[in-house]
Amino acid sequence: MVNFSVLPPEINSGRMFFGAGSGPMLAAAAAWDGLAAELGLAAESFGLVTSGLAGGSGQAWQGAAAAAMVVAAAPYAGWLAAAAARAGGAAVQAKAVAGAFEAARAAMVDPVVVAANRSAFVQLVLSNVFGQNAPAIAAAEATYEQMWAADVAAMVGYHGGASAAAAALAPWQQAVPGLSGLLGGAANAPAAAAQGAAQGLAELTLNLGVGNIGSLNLGSGNIGGTNVGSGNVGGTNLGSGNYGSLNWGSGNTGTGNAGSGNTGDYNPGSGNFGSGNFGSGNIGSLNVGSGNFGTLNLANGNNGDVNFGGGNTGDFNFGGGNNGTLNFGFGNTGSGNFGFGNTGNNNIGIGLTGDGQIGIGGLNSGTGNIGFGNSGNNNIGFFNSGDGNIGFFNSGDGNTGFGNAGNINTGFWNAGNLNTGFGSAGNGNVGIFDGGNSNSGSFNVGFQNTGFGNSGAGNTGFFNAGDSNTGFANAGNVNTGFFNGGDINTGGFNGGNVNTGFGSALTQAGANSGFGNLGTGNSGWGNSDPSGTGNSGFFNTGNGNSGFSNAGPAMLPGFNSGFANIGSFNAGIANSGNNLAGISNSGDDSSGAVNSGSQNSGAFNAGVGLSGFFR
């Protein structure tokens, strides 16, 4: 379970302020006080009755037998008195724990104050266009670190007080030495059973599920604690297949992500590689939008930093399709331009070529264009600063679509290259919002995945944070199945390794899991290559494949995902070649469907470096 010393103040303060508080402990103390009073009264009454019978004026008990009975009754009176003292001690220690809690709560930072600090930090970062907020950002972070330290110090004090109170409690079985000798065997049996049950409860890890390694998990196959979900490696995740902590979603690698398939920290979105992104498919940090490659971009498909608009290449551009720095407008190539389709620097106008020009130079400043506002060459469309584009607002080259800062994309808002789809900052993907490379699917930040929401590599399925899995929500590696936190399992909910079945926290002996596999380190069915290793799924040959019936080249690794691929590093269905993503492509380094040649995107293209369709 995650220790409080590594948890941020949002978690520690929230638990202390929004939990049950000291009320239940004070109620327990009152109950122990009541029990102590009742036991004390019973002990006093029992002693008075016994002494009255034995030594009263009437001498109700006489003879040797009566004397023996008086002697036998004395330990019971002593037991009642000792039990009353133990109950009173428990009440005192319960009050001490409640007092320690109240002292810690008073020393904790109010969650409202923590939230205000984080909100101010985000606002400062988003508005830090020219770096003017750097001192304020540093001050906010310093204050946040002080909050973290204050919360940890308060929790250390609480832990010390509670531990001291627990240590002061005397075990109940030592309250009356020798009492068990006075009881018959029938009475001893329930006591022994209760003691065994108590020991069993103490050893119980309190998981609601199977195959967990850790405590307080609500789910199965987790390695860690306080997860609500299955197949997580880490703590306090709300979802499945995460590798890390405090994630709200599935298939994340990192901490505090609210979404799926992220690699990094605190991303509210999916398929991001980096931290603090509000959107999907970004590579970088603190972007508000999707498909950006860089930092602090406000829009989509930018390649650079602090751009306000889409499809820009460069920094500090306001508009779309610009290639350069500090341009205000659309389709400019250069820096400091204000307007449309200018080539050069510090121009104000439309279609100007050169530096410091003011006016209207033409529909386009480039050559061979059909359209308006193009500063590049051989474009068909509007406001393209790159070359050979069909569409608008493209700052890259050879794109079919709009808002692409990368090259040879078919789609829109792609900052990477050779993508078929939209919102991808990675390269060679088929789908949407992929931050990784050569994926066939969506929201993947890893590479060579077939599916969606994978932050690992070479998976066939979805929400896998590990590598080379066939299935879903696996945080481990080379699993065939679902919700596995361990490695090389065939089945589900396994926190251990090399299991064939469900819900095991153990590591089994053997080279492979599953059925009919040869080689080493394989899971699934019928992976029959004697020299193969690291395969998951069904009927694969080679190394590192996931999915169904993939074949790597002889004596070389495969690392394919999907179905019936031949070659290496392919993702999708029936591809033949290398680094292909999609369906039925042949050649190398292409994405899409039924392309032949190399470095193509789209569908039904034959050649080199083509985007679009039927070219």
Swiss-Prot record:
InterPro entries: Mycobac_pentapep, PPE_dom, PPE_sf. Pfam families: Pentapeptide_2 (PF01469), PPE (PF00823). One of its GO terms (biological process) is response to host immune response. It comes from the Bacteria. Signal peptide: none annotated. Belongs to the mycobacterial PPE family. This is Uncharacterized PPE family protein PPE40. It comes from Mycobacterium tuberculosis (strain CDC 1551 / Oshkosh).
